[in-house]
């Protein structure tokens, strides 16, 4: 069979199982109210948790950065592409999130996926055992596979099982890997216990704070700051295209760890540095996140989270016990989930249907993503739509 025929058959199978993914095209900036595929909608799909993606100060910072540093970096960070904007952002990030370790540094990446691959492949290898939460993000899973380390998967947030696995391991190097906020469930990892286990067993703890950075902790400094953790064994990874409203990612750790990544992390070394203007805008975003406006946006977001939790409990479906901006509602079957999402879409509400392989079979769900840009009136619309669908399903 020709390769194209093989792919076509595979696509037919994806369609038959109700698993084909389709891109939608936004005609306006990321915001609570958008025009998508030519239609006005209220969006509950983005990870713009603080509503900063269209913030006037960040738009101005992008323009200023482009005027100062140009449209592109022109090279990799080690071959001419490392600009003053990148260097300044790394200093800003180290100061903002690096309080968990002495002599902290930060390293800026183009994407969170690259940051996770870079960290795991540079720090782990043969002779290393990675202990990975069962619901970790795909980029952590792929990084673990590419590292060539032995990988042991522990049940989701089950620290008793993890403890037993660590006790039984005779690996030269042990690394615990976990999301902080899990992207499809919205729950938070037991970070204090994970760090306790890491220190007991002389292990690294690498956490991906993609959905916690900017939202959790004092001044939005993230899940590690919220848990008040400090340790040289700790490495924090965060993204800058979610709550920060721009793009990119970072790794924060002791300066020796960061220098090792500069020397050995292939996804950092062998790629063109990101647009300097984006780095310039992220520095502006950090000032908003850590200031009074950031506090006000987080407070409003918490109000929306509380209301949404109560709203979802009143439906005939299964809400996940999430206290974060990720509010899942488990429907179960793929077809039913797609139909509910389509009905909400016809009512002008964009609520994504999440299906396998992103989530386990039988747990297809609506993933309601809240933003400080949403108003109570936006939630009124969502609540009305869910109530109508719930009445039909009851």
From Swiss-Prot:
InterPro entries: Aminotransferase_I/II_large, AON_synthase_class-II, AONS_Archaea/Proteobacteria, AONS_Proteobacteria, PyrdxlP-dep_Trfase, PyrdxlP-dep_Trfase_major, PyrdxlP-dep_Trfase_small. Pyridoxal 5'-phosphate binds at residues 112-113, 183, 211, 239. GO terms for molecular function: 8-amino-7-oxononanoate synthase activity; pyridoxal phosphate binding. Pathway: Cofactor biosynthesis; biotin biosynthesis. Gene3D superfamilies: Aspartate Aminotransferase, domain 1 (3.90.1150.10), Type I PLP-dependent aspartate aminotransferase-like (Major domain) (3.40.640.10). NCBIfam families: bioF. Catalyzes the decarboxylative condensation of pimeloyl-[acyl-carrier protein] and L-alanine to produce 8-amino-7-oxononanoate (AON), [acyl-carrier protein], and carbon dioxide. This is 8-amino-7-oxononanoate synthase. The lineage of its organism: Bacteria, Pseudomonadati, Pseudomonadota, Betaproteobacteria, Burkholderiales.
């Amino acid at each position: 069979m020709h390769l194209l025929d093989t792919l076509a058959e595979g696509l037919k199978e994806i369609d038959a199982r109700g698993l084909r993914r389709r891109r939608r095209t936004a005609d306006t900036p990321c915001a609570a109210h958008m025009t998508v595929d030519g239609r006005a909608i209220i969006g509950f799909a983005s990870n713009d948790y603080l509503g900063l993606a269209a913030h006037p100060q960040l738009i101005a910072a992008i323009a200023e950065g482009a005027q100062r540093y140009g449209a592109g970096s022109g090279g990799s960070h080690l071959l001419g592409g490392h600009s003053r904007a990148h260097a300044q952002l790394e200093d800003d990030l180290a100061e903002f999130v690096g309080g968990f370790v002495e002599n902290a540094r930060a390293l800026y990446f183009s994407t969170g996926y690259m940051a996770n691959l870079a960290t795991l492949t540079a720090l782990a290898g043969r002779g290393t055992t990675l202990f990975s939460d069962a619901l970790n993000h795909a980029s952590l899973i792929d990084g673990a596979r590419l590292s060539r380390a032995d990988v042991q998967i522990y049940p989701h947030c089950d620290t008793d099982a993890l403890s037993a696995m660590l006790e039984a391991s005779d690996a030269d190097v042990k690394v615990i890997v976990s999301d902080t906020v899990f992207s499809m469930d919205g729950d938070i990892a037991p970070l204090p216990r994970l760090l306790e286990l890491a220190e007991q067993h002389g292990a690294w703890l690498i956490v991906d704070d993609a959905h916690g950075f900017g939202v959790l902790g004092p001044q939005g400094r993230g899940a590690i700051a919220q848990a008040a953790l400090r340790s040289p064994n700790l490495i924090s990874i965060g993204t800058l295209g979610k709550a920060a409203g721009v793009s990119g990612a970072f790794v924060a750790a002791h300066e020796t760890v960061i220098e090792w990544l500069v020397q050995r992390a292939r996804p950092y070394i062998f790629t063109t540095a990101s647009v300097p203007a984006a780095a310039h805008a992220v520095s502006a975003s950090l000032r908003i996140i850590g200031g009074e406006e950031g506090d006000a946006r987080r407070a409003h977001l918490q109000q929306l989270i509380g209301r949404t939790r109560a709203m979802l409990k009143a439906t005939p479906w299964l809400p996940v016990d999430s206290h974060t901006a990720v509010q899942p509602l488990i429907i179960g079957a793929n077809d039913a989930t797609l139909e509910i999402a389509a009905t909400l879409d016809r009512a002008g509400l964009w609520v994504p249907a999440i299906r396998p392989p992103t989530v386990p079979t039988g747990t297809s769900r609506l993933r309601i993503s809240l933003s400080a840009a949403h108003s109570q009136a936006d939630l009124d619309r969502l609540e009305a739509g869910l109530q109508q669908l719930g009445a039909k399903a009851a």
